[in-house]
């Protein structure tokens, strides 16, 4: 399997830490070049330095992906340094809580709703809008959107804005798969369950334990397990797979 992505450029948003980093490192390990976009400027610069020290071709760009002009600048910078991308992973996502709790509709400030929609949904349109012209011209491309099991079934540990945006990504995935198919560009989505990321360390242990107990495999997933599924969608092995949503959830909230 080594070298599946030799000389291919993959752009990953929300790529500093957790699932995003696992995806970037998966591409790099198999010969790819990694465009890393994240809001964490200090962490991103250190991450890029570490990747380059290990001999990888990587380019970090600090950006607020809720703003189109910053997405555009990031895409252009990565294209200039690494070449145009044939793989785009829209991984970025936020799920705000207040005192560790997801707010109900009557409690949620409209600004919070707007911010989640901007980051989780608008950014996916922006990045896909920017990346697909090259893919269409080359008749080669992979777009992978990071949805969630919360976009497929009710999940009481997230708020409505997160569920709505992740469900929206499923709709975009299917629509774009139909639009781009004749150009040999595939569009698929992943729907992770509870994944053991650094962010989960801020969640009370009893919540994660409860999720593990109602998951068929009786454990949380790892970022690397999500990355493995992402790399499959991005690979030539998935060239005849498009418009699909793959749960990576260990049997939690099976749909």
Regions found by a protein language model. Give the residues of each.
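Residue(s) in the substrate-gating loop at a strand-loop-helix junction
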Residues: 148
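Active-site helix of classical SDR
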Residues: 128, 165, 173
């Amino acid at each position: 399997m080594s070298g599946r992505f030799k000389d291919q450029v993959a752009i990953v948003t929300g790529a500093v830490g957790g699932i995003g980093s696992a995806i970037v490192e998966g591409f790099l390990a198999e010969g790819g070049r990694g465009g890393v976009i994240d809001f964490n400027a200090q962490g991103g610069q250190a991450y890029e330095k570490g990747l380059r020290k290990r001999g990888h071709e990587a380019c970090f760009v600090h950006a607020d992906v809720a703003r189109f002009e910053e997405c555009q600048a990031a895409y252009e910078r990565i294209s200039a340094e690494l070449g145009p991308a044939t793989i785009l992973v829209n991984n970025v996502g936020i799920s705000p809580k207040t005192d560790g709790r997801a707010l109900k509709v009557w409690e949620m400030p409209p600004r919070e709703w707007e911010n989640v929609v901007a980051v989780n949904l608008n950014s996916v349109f922006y990045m896909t809008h920017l990346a697909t012209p090259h893919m269409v011209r080359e008749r080669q491309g992979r777009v992978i959107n990071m949805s969630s099991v919360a976009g497929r079934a009710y999940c009481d540990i997230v708020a409505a804005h997160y569920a709505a945006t992740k469900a929206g990504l499923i709709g975009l995935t299917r629509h774009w798969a139909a639009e781009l198919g004749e150009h040999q560009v595939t569009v698929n989505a992943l729907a992770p369950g509870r994944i053991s990321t650094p962010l989960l360390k801020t969640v009370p242990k009893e919540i994660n334990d409860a999720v593990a107990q109602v998951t068929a495999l009786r454990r949380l997933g790892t970022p690397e397990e999500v990355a493995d599924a992402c790399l499959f969608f991005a690979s030539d092995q998935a060239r005849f797979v498009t418009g699909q949503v793959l749960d990576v959830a260990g049997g939690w909230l099976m749909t």
